[in-house]
């Protein structure tokens, strides 16, 4: 190793000194490249410090709930988000399938812009699909809302929807994790749906349409796999009578079941 280090040094000693002026006046790309590389590293660090780092998260959840009459429903949710702290894109898909019926789908594509450290404003499109209906199986509307944390760290989504046939509605979803241990966690939650107007062929009654208040208890096998049990109280005001559906009365029910959630 010593001789290897000495060899290039002896070559330098034998260099023709008449070349010094030429070397001094020629461009030095290696030095410039190092400076450019250093500037790029500093710029990347600056972006990360100011919320410019791109990240992605996907959550999939599926649960089976049953009411007091033994009627069951499979509820599945898929959510993925990608972007920076300031700008993100959300894709949210909800699927509900009652026993002996086709699934109902609710999909949203949202652009999310940071308002503050705890709140984003979101806007986008909503797509509904219900193959149980004879007409109006597919509908598209606009959505605007907010996503973030309230005081006491309740994660909250609040959206206003405007769709076909003068359908205007509002939804609120809020939840919070309460740690019992590092792996056993309570999650109280509240889901509310308010109908302001609905002139569709399958109109729902206006004002408070549905409510679900529940408590989820989950066990985190790890940060990616989380089975849970769920108990809840549900309220449904019912539907208006139209040419395509019969009038239905309000309904209160207790729900219980379980499911599993994946994060990756």
Language model regions located:
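Outer-membrane beta-barrel "beta-signal"
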Residues: 220, 250-264
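Hydrophobic, lipid-facing positions within transmembrane beta-strands of outer-membrane proteins
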Residues: 56-58, 74-78, 105-109, 140-144, ...
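Transmembrane beta-strand segments that form the barrel wall of outer-membrane beta-barrel proteins
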Residues: 57-66, 87-98, 119-131, 153-164, ...
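Residue-level signature of outer-membrane beta-barrel architecture
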Residues: 82-84, 113, 148, 162, ...
């Amino acid at each position: 190793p010593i001789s290897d280090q000495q060899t290039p040094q002896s070559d330098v000693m034998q260099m023709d000194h008449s070349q010094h002026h030429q070397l001094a006046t020629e461009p030095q790309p290696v030095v410039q490249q190092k400076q450019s590389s250093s500037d790029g590293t500093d710029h990347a660090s600056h972006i990360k410090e100011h919320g410019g780092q791109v990240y992605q998260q996907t959550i999939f959840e599926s649960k089976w709930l049953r009411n007091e009459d033994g009627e069951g429903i499979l509820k599945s949710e898929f959510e993925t988000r990608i972007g920076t702290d300031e700008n993100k894109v959300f894709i949210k898909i909800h699927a509900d399938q009652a026993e002996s019926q086709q699934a109902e789908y609710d999909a949203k594509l949202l652009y999310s812009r940071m308002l503050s450290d705890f709140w984003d404003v979101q806007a986008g499109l909503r797509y509904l699909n219900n193959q149980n209906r004879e007409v109006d199986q597919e509908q598209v509307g606009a959505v605007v809302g907010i996503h973030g944390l309230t005081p006491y760290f309740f994660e909250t989504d609040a959206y206003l929807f405007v769709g076909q046939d003068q359908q205007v509605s509002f939804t609120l979803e809020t939840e919070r994790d309460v740690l019992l241990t590092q792996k056993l966690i309570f999650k109280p939650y509240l889901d509310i749906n308010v109908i302001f107007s609905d002139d569709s062929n399958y109109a729902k009654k206006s004002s408070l349409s549905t409510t679900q208040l529940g408590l989820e208890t989950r066990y985190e096998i790890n940060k990616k796999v989380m089975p849970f049990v769920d108990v809840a109280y549900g309220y449904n005001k019912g539907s208006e009578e139209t040419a395509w559906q019969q009038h239905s009365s309000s309904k209160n029910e207790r729900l219980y079941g379980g499911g599993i959630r994946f994060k990756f």
